[in-house]
């Protein structure tokens, strides 16, 4: 598992995020690992916008498995709004995994619910509505620094069970049912 691999290569005057050299290193690691033991799989953890995340498959010569980071916030957004438009649209637009690769679908982790993966999928209004709903349910929001000193929401810190205690209209009696449905 290559954790936060998108930040691997550091170069002055860049964001140090998702640079071409990082992809070269992942390809090199895959070549070395396949030579040593072809049964070993590389999984990349890249909590970045979905399009950039997909780039870690390369041409079938980088990661064998990538975390599907857009799935948790999209399921959450669909469950609390009652609208599956964005989730369905994303699912229908996802390319099939190439031969020898696959997606790791998950709906919760020890980290927060990332918002970067849904940049370009959810509108800013939808993201803000999700943030406000999660704050109402006790969630905290982590932010990242942007150029110029401003901040942008990065992650919602709340358990999935707590996040599903209601809808945008507020808490209700369907938390357990909603939690089971998410699975």
Predicted regions and their residues:
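Active-site and adjacent substrate-binding regions of carbohydrate-active enzymes
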Residues: 1-183
């Amino acid at each position: 598992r290559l954790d936060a691999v998108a930040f691997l290569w550091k170069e002055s005057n860049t964001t140090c995020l998702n640079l071409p050299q990082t992809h070269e290193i992942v390809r090199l690691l895959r070549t070395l690992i396949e030579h040593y033991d072809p049964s070993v799989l590389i999984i990349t953890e890249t909590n970045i916008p979905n399009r950039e995340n997909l780039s870690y498959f390369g041409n079938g010569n980088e990661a064998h498995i990538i975390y599907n980071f857009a799935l948790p916030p999209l399921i959450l957004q669909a469950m609390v709004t009652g609208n599956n438009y964005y989730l369905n649209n994303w699912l229908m637009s996802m390319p099939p995994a190439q031969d020898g690769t696959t997606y790791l679908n998950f709906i919760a982790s020890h980290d927060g619910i990332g918002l970067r993966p849904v940049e370009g999928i959810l509108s800013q209004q939808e993201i803000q509505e999700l943030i406000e709903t999660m704050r109402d349910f006790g969630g905290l929001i982590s932010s990242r620094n942007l150029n110029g000193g401003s901040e942008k929401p990065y992650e919602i810190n709340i358990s999935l069970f707590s996040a599903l205690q209601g809808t945008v209209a507020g808490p209700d009696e369907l938390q357990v049912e909603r939690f089971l449905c998410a699975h």
